Amino acid sequence: NDKILIYEDTNGDGKADKETVFADKLHLPIGFEFAPGGVYVSQEPHLVFLADANGDDKADSKEVVLTGFDSHDTHHAISAFAADPSGAFMMCEGIFLHSNVETPYGPVRGVHGGFYRFSPQKTKLERTSQFGLPNPWGFAFDKWGQDFLIHTSSTTMNWHLPLTLRGDYGVSAPATIDLTPAGQAVRPTSGLEFISSRHFPEQVQGDILLANSIGFLGMKQHSVVDDGTGYKTAFRHDLFKSTDPNFRPVDHEFAPDGSLYVVDWHNVLVGHAQHNARDPLRDHVHGRIYRITYPSRPLVKPVVVDGASIEALLENLKEPEDRVRYRSRRELREHPVTKVIPAVQKWVASLDINDPNYPHSLLEALWVTWGMNAVDSDLLRKCLSNGDYHVRAAAVRVLRYNFNKFPDTLDLLKKAAADEHGRVRLEATMAATWFNKGSALEVVTIAKNKGVDGWSKTQTDAAAARLQGKVEVKEEENPMPPIPANLSDTEKASFTAGHKIYFREGHCATCHQKDGKGLDPAFPPLHNSIYVHGNPDRLIKLTLHGLVGAFELNGKKYDGQVPMTPFGGMLNDKEIADVLTYARNQFGNSASAISPQQVTTIREATKGMTGFYRMENLLKEHPLEK
């Protein structure tokens, strides 16, 4: 009986003192977003709309809007909803799912990880991006409408635009640059938010915040600055971290007063594959919400949003805080389009063109008309030709979702493709793949001839290939390393097969990392590890049955709180032999190969074992070599 709860601070002391159940009898509502009249919620295999008809903060009805989202691996299901400036929202979906959703515009299918975009105004679902990501639980938009994401199961953070070229079912977009600063890789990440609050120091505005819930238990803060077509990041600091081993920060958002709210799932068990669904240690009562303030700076005085007039809501769009503008745009969509559009036009006419924030205000006005499903043509053209490339790039995004409303769409895209700034050109290139007409290739060609960089070259080539019906040749993501010469032909074949198993999603590289160096303090390295190149029986046992609890390796302590997955039920004896042969002859290790017969013998000898190994018990059976 999962619920959506409303917490209120009625006396302004910074602590919740009122709880309202908006909706109950739900099952795993792992994504939701507000819309006029209610809330969209993930209820796999459905996307449902919970309507509050009388404004009493309680859902009165439930409508299944779409169905067919895969649910057989629930923690990969549609989640972490994030609204774009129009009010359409992105939905994250993990790698192990195969969704087939019937929509008014035809079926939408997704596989192998990616993002959907649902537009409530049009009841339209789109598979916006398809690429090699494992399990995304974080998505965020910056003040200019550019979107960013985290991979969760891996340590990667990406700018989303380069991944949004239209593709065929099951065909992934080429990988793009990882924005995670060197030395700051953590996993599993969850929740993503840009700092946009006058309550926080000026120098950190625009920084990005991401939470992590295993190993490093806290929140990373990185600066994000423009860098050519794309961006570059730098580690700012850890905004907070905890020594409570059950602390699990999973989401965060800025409040109307500029403070930051953080959701702590707070659970001793975090592995879905390692623990029984009904394990009594699963914690259903200790979830928390924290509020973070900056004591030496005043809180932001909240502006009126709920119940405000159209004119007041438009004035709110001048506020510096992203979340204030987000909530004001959402409130504007509650009003009739026949009243909002004339008010927007009047508001734009009243703006001071000499105001440094004029370009952004112009863009906000365009976004309001987009959200009303009535894009203002004059506003769009003003933004497409604005002197600020951020505005021009954002305007191309608006055009990309409104092709059919402008007879000169192709000409507008061509002009954007010839823009002086690479970000505008990349927006035009990605948009052209969705234009889906032969003439769209002209747009990509113009952009390529104008110039590409590390952010756009591969993506532009892929866009051209797809528009010509070609299958782009991708570089091997995890190239085969040199095979040790001392192995026999049979062992070399085993090493090669083991390399592929090592990099399977949810297998070895997920925790121990691609380079075998692990992630302190949760995931130990395989690099030069006595547990890998030492006694083969010990290694086979922990691979078959998993490992839990603290232990020490090469002078470092690992908490072992999240158990190593027991692979005995996931891999057969040959597969285990292959991947262990690979690990024992890679990452600085050099040891004998493992045969399937060795695995079979150990499996038979330990078939009565239940639960995980603990290192102290394993070492009693197989002491470390001296």
Descriptions of predicted regions:
Residues 130, 519-525:
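Short cysteine/histidine-rich zinc-coordinating motifs and their immediately flanking basic loops
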Residues 312, 327, 339, 394, ...:
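Extracytoplasmic/secreted proteins, especially bacterial periplasmic and envelope-associated proteins
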Residues 506, 525-541, 545, 549-553, ...:
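Electron-transfer interface patches adjacent to heme c in soluble/periplasmic c-type cytochromes
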Residues 180, 184, 236-250, 254-501, ...:
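Extracellular/periplasmic ectodomains of large secreted or surface enzymes and adhesion receptors
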Residues 472-493, 553-554, 558-626:
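Flexible coil segments in periplasmic/lumen-exposed cytochrome c-class electron-transfer proteins
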Residues 294-295, 511-519, 544, 548, ...:
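Detector for the c-type heme attachment site
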Residues 1-313, 331-333:
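Beta-propeller domains with acidic blade repeats across secreted/periplasmic ectodomains
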Residues 491-519, 532-545:
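Sequence/structural segment immediately N-terminal to covalent heme-attachment motifs in c-type
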